[in-house]
């Protein structure tokens, strides 16, 4: 194990608005915005648009409404990963920017980020827990707990794209897969890189 779960983590309670804004942007880029907005409803859409104008913490209820509306689109796994890639690219500048710059200049590996994943995760989510288990020098499992967003296929699969893109900042290539969900509020990802 490289990064253990936080002892007795609290349930996820808020999500950084940049995640939702980036996810929404990914849906818009793929031509799904109109259908997404129908699923979301006008009152929630207005709250989300106002909330994502500036970086702030949004309630898990609002985040769940966003991801549930996106989940109802029933996008293919490939499309979900593409949306995750868009989110990752947009977050690179704000959340991972300093690490990305360090990696490009000093030969940092994915373990550099994975060893700090709890801190990086804490910049995106308040509550819940994330842990990293080392399987081999270029192989890990990332486990998410106490996060109700993990119950939504859209969030689980799109996160694969985000993780892959983030890993490829530090490696030539990466592969990320999500295991079938076993318990509510949890997700497990297998990540490998070259």
What is each of the regions a protein language model found here?
Residues 4-5, 9-12, 17-20, 122-157, ...:
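Short terminal or interdomain "cap/linker" segment that borders an active site or interface and mediates
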Residues 52-157, 180:
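Amphipathic interaction/junction segments at domain boundaries or subunit interfaces
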Residues 1-78:
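N-terminal leader/assembly segments
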Residues 160:
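Short amphipathic alpha-helical segment that frequently serves as the phosphate-/nucleotide-binding helix
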Residues 37, 167-168:
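Residue-level preference for well-ordered alpha-helical positions
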Residues 42-50, 91-92, 182-193:
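Short, mixed-charge aromatic SLiMs
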Residues 8, 14-17, 22-23, 42, ...:
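Generic serine detector
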């Amino acid at each position: 194990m490289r990064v253990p779960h936080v002892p007795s983590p609290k349930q996820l309670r808020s999500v950084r608005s940049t995640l939702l804004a980036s996810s929404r942007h990914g849906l818009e880029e793929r031509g799904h915005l109109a259908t997404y907005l129908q699923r979301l409803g006008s009152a929630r859409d207005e709250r989300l648009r106002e909330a994502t104008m500036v970086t702030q913490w949004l309630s898990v209820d609002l985040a769940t409404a966003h991801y549930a509306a996106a989940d109802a689109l029933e996008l293919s796994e490939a499309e979900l990963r593409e949306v995750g890639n868009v989110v990752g690219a947009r977050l690179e500048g704000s959340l991972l920017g300093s690490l990305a710059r360090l990696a490009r200049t000093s030969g940092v590996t994915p373990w550099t980020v994975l060893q700090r994943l709890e801190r990086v995760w804490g910049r995106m989510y308040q509550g819940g827990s994330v842990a990293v288990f080392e399987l081999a020098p270029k192989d890990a499992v990332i486990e998410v707990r106490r996060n109700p967003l993990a119950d939504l296929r859209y969030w689980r699969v799109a996160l694969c794209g985000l993780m892959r893109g983030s890993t490829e900042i530090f490696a030539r290539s990466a592969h990320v897969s999500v295991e079938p969900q076993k318990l509510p509020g949890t997700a497990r990802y297998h990540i490998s890189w070259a």
